[in-house]
């Protein structure tokens, strides 16, 4: 009796609400221009991976033959090299697990390229740590010898009559070894003429004085004034003297 009752009740029950909805096909397809996940999966599965693998093997074998013909050694791609203390993933043909400062790496590179060693402050040293013969016999940079009358004091002509010590010092102060500027005013030989300015510039040594002489020879004092005079410099013949004789080229 109970089974028959329940069977009749189930026959009169309405179907579930989900079954009443009509399936809509627009939800099953993705918008235009966008592929669904299944389509992407099918596309990846259809990709010809075997052909790509074969091409890679062909390139690798050709590269190995190139290294063998050039006398180089090929290494496994799983090795790593350390350059400057930082590890990098190494490609084919690099040194395994060595830094540029490692002597063993330097020895290997000398057998391959034999170039100069840049790890020792730019000196031309082989990877074996020995100086080449030409580097030992090579002379150093040539220096221009100073003239016999070179001194640590320069005598300067061509300064305007109204020049001040501060203005002249501003010209010579940028040079290495500069020490002092001394100005000596002399009365003009002509009545009413401008006074004559004798200028002496002291440096630490004759080499510093020669550098300033070479750089400032013919220096135009006033670039705006077209009639401005040009500096004329020479080594002072008597560096210890504080004043000169009569005339612009007296005893110096």
Curated annotation (Swiss-Prot):
The scientific name of the source species is Medicago truncatula (Barrel medic)
| Ranges of Gly residues composition bias in the record | 242-252
Query: Any idea what job this protein has?
Result: Probable RNA-binding protein.
Which InterPro entries does the annotation name? Nucleotide-bd_a/b_plait_sf, RBD_domain_sf, RRM_dom
GO MF, one term, reads:
mRNA binding
Family matches, as Pfam families: RRM_1 (PF00076)
The domain of life is Eukaryota
Designated gene of the protein? RBP2
For this UniProt record, the keywords arranged alphabetically read as follows: RNA-binding
Q: How is this protein named in the record?
A: RNA-binding protein 2
Report residue spans for region: Disordered.
Answer: 1-34, 232-252
Q: Which parts of the sequence belong to the RRM domain? A: 152-238
Lineage per the UniProt record: Eukaryota, Viridiplantae, Streptophyta, Embryophyta, Tracheophyta
